[in-house]
């Protein structure tokens, strides 16, 4: 831009005829303009350098921010992985505990079956013992009763009773069946 102004001024000076003083004044003015332009360009360069530095600072800040953001993201990912591991461990621990509870229930169920079997066996044993005892006592009582009757009854009385029963059995079919059953007819 500065060159364009100089060329424009130079061309303008040829088209006009200037006196040597005017030419000197014009050259001074051009020199002042040139100096001013150089100062302006220097200031603009300094400002551009400052702007460049600011952009570099902003870029550095963005890079730092991005780095911190990446670090934060990596830290969050690590924490999420740790949380996932904890959940997996917790799930495995819960599964183990449920398996232990299931085993305990199975043991209790088996124990209840054993108790039921023992109770059933005891009940059956008591019933069988009561039945056996009753039969034994009844048989023994019958035998003792017959023996006592035989002792009380003399053989002669016993024969008379048996003869009376045999005669009654001729008319009573039920009594006849009973006597035959015991081999008394």
From Swiss-Prot:
Subcellular location(s) of the protein:
Cell membrane
Native organism is Aquifex aeolicus (strain VF5)
Recorded superkingdom: Bacteria
Q: Its family?
A: To A.aeolicus aq_1900.
- Residue ranges of the TM segments: 1-21, 111-131
Membrane topology term: Multi-pass membrane protein
Q: What is this protein called?
A: Uncharacterized protein aq_1446
GO CC, alphabetical: plasma membrane
Q: Is-annotated flag, keyword Cell cycle?
A: no
Q: Which UniProt keywords apply?
A: Cell membrane, Membrane, Transmembrane, Transmembrane helix
């Amino acid at each position: 831009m500065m060159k364009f102004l100089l060329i424009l001024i130079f061309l303008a000076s040829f088209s006009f005829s200037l006196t040597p003083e005017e030419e000197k004044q014009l050259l001074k003015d051009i020199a002042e303009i040139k100096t001013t332009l150089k100062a302006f360009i220097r200031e603009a360069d300094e400002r551009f350098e400052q702007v460049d530095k600011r952009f570099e600072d902003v870029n550095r800040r963005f890079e730092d921010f991005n780095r911190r953001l990446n670090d934060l993201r990596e830290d969050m990912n690590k924490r999420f992985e740790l949380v996932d591991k904890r959940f997996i461990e917790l799930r495995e621990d819960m599964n183990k505990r449920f398996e232990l509870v299931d085993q305990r229930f199975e043991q209790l169920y088996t124990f209840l079956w054993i108790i039921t079997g023992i109770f059933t066996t005891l009940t059956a044993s008591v019933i069988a013992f009561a039945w056996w005892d009753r039969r034994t006592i009844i048989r023994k009582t019958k035998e003792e009763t017959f023996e006592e009757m035989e002792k009380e009854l003399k053989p002669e009385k016993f024969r008379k009773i048996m003869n009376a029963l045999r005669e009654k059995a001729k008319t009573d079919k039920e009594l006849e069946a009973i006597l035959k059953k015991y081999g008394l007819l």
